[in-house]
């Protein structure tokens, strides 16, 4: 019975804890086979019968330690590690590692995959497979490009400096010197003769000077043709017709005032009245809707001709009816 202060432990009791029923059984399959081969009870296993004569004892393992480990050997792990390191060192010395010379020899003994495929019995020699996979004939730069390796910048700079030095040396060595048999006077005489034989370059200059003038004339002609086309267009004619109607509608009271002023003594002359009527008509015409289309001076003459016969007709009617005199407002 355990003490009250101790930890409670579960214990399992079996009928045969030492497994004596199995050890005392002589009809086991393994024992029969060993007896057929010359073994008997009390002898050890092995060729010289030096093995254990008793059965292996079973021990209950209730911890996380390795097989065969006990609490007494917990502090000996450093010694175990040292023994393991010594064992590895002994194995390395016995078998021996490969030296650097052997690795260099292996690198030199490179084989061609293409030749190996030709020799093989299975005949797997196809050009598109073997030649593309055979890297023995490739240079270091090609392999670096394939596998994506980058070289140091120092090596690239050294290569550039060496190439530039070689170019300078080649340029110095490949310079050629020519000696002419002509004298200085003969050389210049030859050059002057060549210059005289060349065609004069003044003609193309005159052509170039004439071309801008011709271009300007062509532009003016194109503009005039475009203006005539616009004037002859039906839209432009309709606009002019509307303008004339507006001018006549707005010019009616202005013409009446002018005729009345002519009948008054000391009134303005016909030319002054016509000029005033034209100016008033122009003021009326220049409305905000039609500010862009300003009438040309040629149309003023036509307007004067149209205004004069109307004035004559109005004078004939005014002779018959009495006219009231009105003062004219002067705009300042």
UniProtKB/Swiss-Prot annotation:
<dbReference type="GO" id="GO:0007080">
    <property type="term" value="P:mitotic metaphase chromosome alignment"/>
</dbReference>
<dbReference type="GO" id="GO:0010521">
    <property type="term" value="F:telomerase inhibitor activity"/>
</dbReference>
<feature type="compositionally biased region" description="Basic residues">
    <location>
        <begin position="297"/>
        <end position="306"/>
    </location>
</feature>
<dbReference type="GO" id="GO:0032211">
    <property type="term" value="P:negative regulation of telomere maintenance via telomerase"/>
</dbReference>
<keyword id="KW-0137">Centromere</keyword>
<comment type="function">
    <text>Microtubule-binding protein essential for faithful chromosome segregation. Mediates TRF1 and TERT accumulation in nucleolus and enhances TRF1 binding to telomeres. Inhibits telomerase activity. May inhibit cell proliferation and act as tumor suppressor.</text>
</comment>
<feature type="modified residue" description="Phosphoserine">
    <location>
        <position position="269"/>
    </location>
</feature>
<dbReference type="GO" id="GO:0070198">
    <property type="term" value="P:protein localization to chromosome, telomeric region"/>
</dbReference>
<keyword id="KW-0597">Phosphoprotein</keyword>
<dbReference type="GO" id="GO:0070034">
    <property type="term" value="F:telomerase RNA binding"/>
</dbReference>
<feature type="compositionally biased region" description="Basic residues">
    <location>
        <begin position="323"/>
        <end position="332"/>
    </location>
</feature>
<feature type="region of interest" description="Disordered">
    <location>
        <begin position="1"/>
        <end position="27"/>
    </location>
</feature>
<keyword id="KW-0539">Nucleus</keyword>
<dbReference type="GO" id="GO:0007004">
    <property type="term" value="P:telomere maintenance via telomerase"/>
</dbReference>
<keyword id="KW-0043">Tumor suppressor</keyword>
<dbReference type="GO" id="GO:0044877">
    <property type="term" value="F:protein-containing complex binding"/>
</dbReference>
<protein>
    <recommendedName>
        <fullName>PIN2/TERF1-interacting telomerase inhibitor 1</fullName>
    </recommendedName>
</protein>
<keyword id="KW-0158">Chromosome</keyword>
<dbReference type="GO" id="GO:0031397">
    <property type="term" value="P:negative regulation of protein ubiquitination"/>
</dbReference>
<comment type="similarity">
    <text>Belongs to the PINX1 family.</text>
</comment>
<feature type="modified residue" description="Phosphoserine">
    <location>
        <position position="274"/>
    </location>
</feature>
<dbReference type="GO" id="GO:1902570">
    <property type="term" value="P:protein localization to nucleolus"/>
</dbReference>
<dbReference type="GO" id="GO:0000228">
    <property type="term" value="C:nuclear chromosome"/>
</dbReference>
<feature type="domain" description="G-patch">
    <location>
        <begin position="26"/>
        <end position="72"/>
    </location>
</feature>
<feature type="modified residue" description="Phosphoserine">
    <location>
        <position position="277"/>
    </location>
</feature>
<dbReference type="GO" id="GO:0005739">
    <property type="term" value="C:mitochondrion"/>
</dbReference>
<dbReference type="GO" id="GO:0000781">
    <property type="term" value="C:chromosome, telomeric region"/>
</dbReference>
<comment type="subunit">
    <text>Interacts with MCRS1, TERT, TERF1, NCL/nucleolin, and the telomerase RNA.</text>
</comment>
<dbReference type="GO" id="GO:0000776">
    <property type="term" value="C:kinetochore"/>
</dbReference>
<dbReference type="GO" id="GO:0010972">
    <property type="term" value="P:negative regulation of G2/M transition of mitotic cell cycle"/>
</dbReference>
<dbReference type="GO" id="GO:0005730">
    <property type="term" value="C:nucleolus"/>
</dbReference>
<dbReference type="InterPro" id="IPR000467">
    <property type="entry name" value="G_patch_dom"/>
</dbReference>
<feature type="modified residue" description="Phosphoserine">
    <location>
        <position position="233"/>
    </location>
</feature>
<feature type="compositionally biased region" description="Basic residues">
    <location>
        <begin position="236"/>
        <end position="246"/>
    </location>
</feature>
<dbReference type="GO" id="GO:0031647">
    <property type="term" value="P:regulation of protein stability"/>
</dbReference>
<dbReference type="GO" id="GO:0005819">
    <property type="term" value="C:spindle"/>
</dbReference>
<dbReference type="InterPro" id="IPR050656">
    <property type="entry name" value="PINX1"/>
</dbReference>
<feature type="compositionally biased region" description="Basic and acidic residues">
    <location>
        <begin position="307"/>
        <end position="322"/>
    </location>
</feature>
<feature type="region of interest" description="Disordered">
    <location>
        <begin position="196"/>
        <end position="332"/>
    </location>
</feature>
<feature type="region of interest" description="Telomerase inhibitory domain (TID)">
    <location>
        <begin position="254"/>
        <end position="328"/>
    </location>
</feature>
<keyword id="KW-0995">Kinetochore</keyword>
<dbReference type="GO" id="GO:0005654">
    <property type="term" value="C:nucleoplasm"/>
</dbReference>
């Amino acid at each position: 019975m355990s003490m009250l202060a101790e930890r409670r432990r579960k214990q399992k009791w079996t009928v045969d804890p030492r497994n004596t029923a199995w050890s005392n059984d002589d009809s086991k399959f393994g024992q029969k086979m060993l007896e057929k081969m010359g073994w008997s009870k009390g002898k050890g296993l092995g060729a010289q019968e030096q093995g254990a004569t008793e059965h292996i004892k079973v021990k209950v393992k209730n911890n996380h330690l390795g097989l065969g480990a006990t609490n007494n050997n917990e502090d000996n792990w450093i010694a175990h590690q040292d023994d393991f390191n010594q064992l590895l060192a002994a194995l390395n010395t016995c078998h021996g590692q490969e030296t650097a010379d052997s690795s260099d020899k292996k690198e030199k003994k490179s084989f061609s995959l293409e030749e190996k495929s030709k020799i093989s019995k299975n005949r797997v020699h196809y050009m598109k497979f073997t030649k593309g996979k055979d890297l023995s004939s490739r240079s270091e730069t090609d392999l670096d490009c394939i596998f994506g390796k980058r070289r140091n910048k120092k090596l690239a700079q050294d290569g550039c400096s060496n190439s530039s030095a070689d170019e300078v040396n080649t340029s110095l060595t490949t310079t050629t010197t020519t000696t002419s048999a002509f004298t200085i006077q003969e050389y210049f005489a030859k050059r002057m003769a060549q210059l005289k034989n060349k065609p004069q370059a003044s003609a193309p200059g005159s052509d170039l000077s004439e071309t801008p003038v011709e271009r300007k004339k062509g532009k003016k002609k194109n503009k005039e043709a475009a203006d005539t086309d616009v004037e002859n267009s039906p839209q432009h004619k309709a606009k002019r017709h509307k303008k004339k109607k507006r001018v006549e509608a707005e010019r009616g009271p202005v013409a009446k005032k002018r005729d009345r002023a002519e009948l008054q003594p000391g009134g303005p002359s016909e030319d002054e009245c016509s000029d005033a009527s034209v100016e008033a008509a122009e003021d009326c015409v220049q409305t905000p809707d039609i500010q862009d289309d300003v009438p040309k001076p040629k149309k003023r003459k036509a307007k004067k001709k149209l205004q004069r016969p109307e004035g004559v007709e109005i004078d004939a009617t005014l002779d018959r009816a009495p006219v009231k005199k009105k003062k004219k407002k002067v705009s300042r």
